[in-house]
């Protein structure tokens, strides 16, 4: 360890001995597939066949919370577990058992995202399988899909594994309201509204079911917390005096929250964790985020400090405890799904900083708790939570400096989002000004108003732009599978101008956008009808007021975005075709097409590949030639996707429509595996570019040029997130002048160029290569994959190689 790194670690301080032990214990856990929830879910579903879906789900959650294993770790100060053991991944048979059954003997043999599984668990899964055959979300979702979209599912063009196999999430609930009112307030409101229903109104029948379901889950959550209170008191009776006092304090908190309003910082943190873990027991959705934790916990922190109930160090320890507990939550995905969510991420985002409105005027929202959250994440240095800082032009300069210091630690956090772009964009979409100023990051780079936004602020169809460009050039036939995807809009070998190709692309992407909407709507309808999540809906405004679940249109706002993959490859491909084929005539259309079909293998085609790679403009270098081309092509999709309402449109929420987003997570690797050679000179099966970042080693003029290229995209329309990854060698930031330069670049990127988002991998190529060869020496090595961080050692070799290949910037 260098002296500079040790100095940096000393700056943030060390974990307390207890939290250091807890962190190590969690890191030592081997993740197992856990069958307990699946068995309990099946027991409940077998007994509730006649119940309406909302009540059936409520009774299921109630049964699970009453019967599941509960435990309190010896080092923790807050309690609540998702599975029978930390880091185990529960199974959710109501969504699907298909991939679990198919992979029972393969989980331990994976290249990445490995899970262990006992023979007992295998038997549990097999024993419940008959009940769920044809009786789950995946089966019903597939049954709703029309024949015309089956080809896209069969060929893997639409990456819908995450939607068919799991819940939605991708939201933050109203933590502020729960802490102020307790679930008692929700219970009282549901009772009052239910009592006032006119049951001669047909809509009131479903509302009554929903309200009764809310009452059921609130009571279940209260009992669940009570189980921990009872366990804590039992353990206190056998503990030493110091630990007994902690356990009794824990018991007191659990007897109160989250049913009653929180009174102290400790109770507030416990309530937040109960909500976080129970919501992930309810459904299998990821990206369940904490929202603006530094804002809604601040009153409790300040009151406790003033009253002498807590010290800064004690509050810091509770926060580190919360983050270590967050790492205990896990999710098992299908092998196919891991290609787009590599590293077993949970995407539990916490947002700090930004602005708040005071008498209608925006003010810097950085507060003492913002600093403490930043410090706590620096101390734990884990993949959870996914920390995002909201930047704005008047941000405290000292706080920005501290954010850069955390970046230097090299675990990919914090990511930075820009208020100056996101807030106006939300207001343009119809979000109330006070709500727009309260937005938080969700999951990766997606953004939403916590507690008021519907599920899934991102789509999951992953439109693969380079693969569709090849399809467009091939008369509508997919080059990978030979299957027809679209109508024949022309063949590249017969085209005589770039405008012909652009016209064919415009028709192709609009056609494919329509197909993706069909798929997403079918799955949304299946989710609405089959797996309504009552607790999550209750905690989202204004589902109780409307008597509707989120999927039925209960949220105040409801916008979703598609995800687009390979934007930079698309840009570079268009530039190569326009310049080298149609302007300079150095390559004929037939020569380029033959080279693509040959995967650039013959000597002549290797010469063509070098021309494509070296002689055509590349996105990421502030070259208007290529940057304008990708904007023109991207606009076709952005314009088209906005035409299609979601299944919630007109049912209550503001919005109910779609916009674009570039949060492709690690789908660039999986989608690349299904994409043949492309006109930018990329070989078949190689990873695509991720997010809106340039293709690997094509950005040759430093980060400022990258920033300028990225901000030429219509970011004000890409409200679903503009994901930009940058990689910097740690030695670069050891020099004070370079740290200052990075801060100046960030200010210029956000203030002058109006950048949306950026995050940094501060890690050397040498370290990553050594970690591949000697993983035992790098257990704690964390890298930024896309909009999230993951432990390098759990990633597949392909994803590791993709991260290593990224351009290493100099300042």
Language-model features, listed with the residues they occupy:
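Conserved catalytic cores of very large enzyme subunits
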Residues: 2-211, 246-249, 253, 257-811
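Extended non-globular scaffold/tether segments
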Residues: 208, 212-224
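Heptad-repeat amphipathic alpha-helical coiled-coil interaction surface used
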Residues: 222, 229, 233-236, 244, ...
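Short amphipathic alpha-helical segments enriched in leucine
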Residues: 226, 230-233, 575, 808
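Acidic, metal/cofactor-coordinating or nucleic-acid-engaging core segments within structured domains
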Residues: 240
């Amino acid at each position: 360890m260098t002296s500079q790194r040790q100095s940096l670690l000393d700056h943030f301080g060390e974990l307390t001995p207890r939290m250091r032990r807890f962190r190590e214990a969690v890191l030592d856990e081997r993740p197992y597939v856990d069958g307990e929830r699946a068995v309990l879910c099946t027991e409940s579903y077998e007994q509730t066949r006649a119940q309406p879906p909302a009540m059936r789900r409520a009774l299921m959650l109630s049964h699970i919370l009453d019967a599941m294993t509960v435990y309190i770790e010896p080092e923790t100060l807050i309690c609540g577990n998702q599975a029978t053991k930390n880091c185990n991944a529960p199974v959710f048979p109501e969504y699907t058992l298909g991939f679990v059954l198919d992979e029972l003997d393969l989980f331990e043999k994976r290249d990445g995202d490995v899970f262990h599984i006992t023979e007992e668990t295998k038997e549990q899964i097999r024993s419940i399988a008959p009940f769920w055959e044809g009786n789950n979300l995946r089966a019903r979702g597939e049954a709703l899909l029309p024949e015309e979209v089956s080809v896209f599912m069969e060929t893997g063009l639409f990456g819908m594994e995450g939607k068919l196999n799991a819940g939605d999430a991708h939201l933050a609930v109203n933590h502020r309201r729960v802490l102020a009112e307790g679930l008692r307030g929700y219970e009282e409101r549901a009772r009052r509204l239910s009592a006032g229903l006119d049951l001669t109104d047909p809509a009131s029948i479903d509302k009554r079911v929903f309200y009764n379901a809310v009452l059921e889950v609130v009571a279940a959550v209260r009992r669940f917390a009570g189980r921990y209170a009872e366990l804590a008191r039992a353990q206190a009776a056998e503990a030493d005096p110091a630990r007994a006092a902690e356990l009794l304090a824990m018991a007191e908190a659990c007897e109160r929250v989250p049913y009653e309003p929180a009174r102290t910082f400790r109770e507030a943190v416990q309530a937040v964790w109960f909500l976080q873990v129970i919501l992930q027991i309810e459904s299998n959705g990821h990206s369940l985020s904490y929202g603006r934790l530094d804002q809604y916990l601040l009153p409790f922190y300040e009151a406790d400090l003033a009253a002498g109930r807590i010290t800064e160090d004690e509050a810091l320890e509770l926060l580190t405890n919360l983050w270590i507990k967050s790492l205990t939550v896990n999710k098992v995905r299908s092998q196919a799904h891991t290609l787009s969510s590599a590293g077993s991420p949970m995407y539990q985002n916490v947002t700090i900083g930004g602005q708040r409105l005071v008498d209608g005027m925006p003010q810097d929202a950085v507060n003492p708790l913002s600093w403490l959250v930043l410090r706590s994440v620096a101390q734990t240095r884990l993949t959870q939570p996914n920390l995002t800082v909201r930047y704005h032009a008047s941000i405290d300069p000292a706080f920005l400096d501290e954010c850069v210091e955390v970046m230097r630690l090299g675990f990919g956090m914090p990511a930075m989002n820009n208020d100056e772009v996101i807030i106006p964009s939300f207001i343009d979409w119809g979000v109330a000004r006070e709500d727009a100023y309260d937005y938080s990051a969700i999951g990766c780079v997606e953004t939403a108003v916590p507690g008021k936004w519907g599920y899934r602020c991102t789509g999951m169809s992953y439109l693969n732009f380079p693969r569709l460009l090849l399809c467009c050039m091939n008369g509508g036939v997919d080059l990978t599978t030979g299957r027809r995807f679209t109508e024949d809009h022309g063949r590249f070998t017969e085209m005589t101008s770039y405008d012909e190709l652009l016209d064919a692309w415009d028709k192709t992407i609009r056609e494919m956008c329509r197909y993706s909407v069909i798929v997403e709507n079918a799955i949304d309808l299946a989710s609405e009808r089959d797996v309504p999540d009552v607790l999550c809906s209750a905690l989202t405004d204004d589902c109780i007021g409307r008597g509707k679940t989120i999927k039925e249109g209960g949220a105040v706002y409801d916008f979703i975005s598609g995800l687009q993959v390979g934007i930079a490859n698309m840009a570079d491909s268009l530039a190569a075709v326009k310049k080298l084929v149609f302007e300079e005539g150095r390559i004929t259309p037939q020569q380029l097409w033959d080279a693509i079909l040959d995967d650039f293998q013959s000597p002549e085609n290797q010469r063509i590949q070098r021309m494509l790679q070296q002689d055509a403009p590349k996105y990421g270098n502030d070259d208007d030639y290529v940057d304008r081309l990708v904007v023109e092509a991207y606009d076709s999709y952005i314009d088209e996707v906005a035409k299609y309402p979601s299944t919630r449109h007109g049912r209550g929420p503001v919005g109910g429509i779609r916009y674009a987003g570039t949060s492709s997570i690690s789908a660039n690797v999986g989608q690349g595996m299904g994409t043949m050679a492309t006109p930018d000179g990329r070989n078949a099966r190689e990873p695509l570019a991720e997010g809106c970042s340039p293709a690997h080693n094509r950005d040759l003029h430093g980060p400022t040029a990258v920033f300028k290229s990225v901000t030429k995209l219509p970011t004000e329309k890409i409200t679903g997130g503009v994901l930009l990854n940058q990689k910097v060698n740690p030695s670069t930031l050891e020099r004070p002048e370079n740290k200052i330069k990075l801060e100046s670049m960030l200010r210029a990127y956000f203030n002058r160029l109006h950048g949306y988002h950026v995050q940094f991998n501060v890690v050397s190529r040498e370290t990553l290569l050594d970690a591949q060869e000697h993983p035992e020496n790098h257990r704690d090595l964390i890298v930024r994959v896309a909009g999230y961080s993951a432990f390098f050692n759990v990633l597949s070799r392909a994803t590791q190689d993709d991260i290593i290949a990224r351009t290493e910037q100099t300042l």
